[in-house]
């Protein structure tokens, strides 16, 4: 009887499970990639250019075209150049203009991050940009991972990011990849509570996503599939299939969690 009840419960909860699996954000730098990611089942897109350098602000024409073609939520990178994350006054003004262009292009959010010359989170400057971006939510990007990776330092930096008013933090837990930083990401998730969303990212692929999801217990994940397929020569059909596989892994991981709760 107990086995029957569990099977019945899983069947009844399947539609809910499909809707409540962790959210998947995919980074893209072309319109074709954005369309492929949407077809593959992504929930949100991060739009940027020059992914090989970590991403910079895309051309406004790409923002507008993506908005016309894509129904998903789109967040856009606000980064005036590649390299470090310590910006001059002129670069800060450029970031402000880029935020305004993103607003006019009807983007759903922005992704940014400014550090101090010593490598800490520049709370004042970031807070200024967060305020300027409203009502668009702000994701603080992996500039967060540039500093020391010990737990105490990560907690302190997390508090600084929260103080900026950002809604989301993209991080690999102070490591090059999310897989390496799983334990620290989990600590950040616990420490953040409901004050900010922790978004694990960094070489996330179908082969390691299940483990990362189970270890971090995060509610959102970020991937560019860069570790799976060569860019930019990959076929977009393969990119779409890769996104679809990431979605499948998240759904399966959620299903396993449900079954574990039943046992």
Where are these regions (language model features)?
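Glycine-enriched alpha-helix->loop->beta-strand junction motifs that scaffold or abut catalytic
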Residues: 39-45, 70-73, 106-109, 132-136, ...
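Active-site mouth loops of central-metabolism enzymes
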Residues: 19-29, 78-96, 115, 140-153
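Hydrophobic faces of well-ordered beta-strands that scaffold small-molecule active sites
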Residues: 22-26, 45-47, 74-78, 110-112, ...
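Alpha-helix-loop-beta-strand connector modules within alpha/beta enzyme cores
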Residues: 55-82, 121-142, 180-205, 238-253
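Glycine-rich phosphate-binding active-site loops on the catalytic face of alpha/beta enzymes
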Residues: 46-56, 101, 105-117, 166-181, ...
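Hydrophobic, well-structured mid-protein blocks that either form specific transmembrane helices
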Residues: 103-164
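Tryptophan (W) side chains
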Residues: 5-8
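Catalytic cores of alpha/beta
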Residues: 32-36, 86-98, 145-164, 185-188, ...
């Amino acid at each position: 009887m107990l086995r029957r009840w569990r099977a019945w419960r899983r069947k009844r909860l399947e539609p809910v499970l499909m809707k409540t699996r962790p959210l998947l954000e995919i980074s893209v730098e072309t319109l074709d990639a954005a369309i492929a990611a949407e077809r593959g089942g992504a929930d949100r897109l991060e739009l940027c250019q020059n992914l090989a350098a970590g991403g910079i602000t895309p051309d406004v024409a790409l923002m507008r075209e993506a908005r016309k073609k894509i129904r998903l939520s789109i967040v856009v990178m606000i980064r005036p150049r590649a390299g470090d994350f310590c910006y001059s006054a002129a670069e800060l003004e450029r970031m402000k203009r880029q935020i305004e262009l993103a607003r006019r292009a009807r983007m759903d959010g922005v992704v940014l991050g400014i550090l101090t010359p010593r490598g800490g989170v520049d709370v004042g400057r970031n807070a200024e940009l967060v305020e300027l971006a409203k009502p668009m939510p702000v994701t603080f990007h992996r500039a967060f991972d540039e500093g020391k990776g010990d737990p105490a330092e990560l907690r302190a930096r997390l508090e600084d990011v929260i103080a900026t008013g950002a809604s989301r933090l993209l991080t690999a837990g102070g490591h090059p990849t999310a897989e390496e930083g799983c334990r620290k990401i989990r600590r950040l998730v616990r420490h953040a509570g409901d004050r900010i969303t922790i978004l694990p990212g960094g070489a996330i692929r179908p082969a390691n996503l299940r483990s990362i999801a189970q270890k971090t217990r995060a509610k959102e994940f970020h991937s560019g599939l860069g570790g799976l397929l060569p860019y930019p020569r990959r076929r977009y059909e393969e990119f779409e299939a890769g996104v679809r596989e990431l979605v499948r892994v998240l759904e399966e991981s959620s299903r396993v969690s449900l079954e574990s709760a039943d046992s």
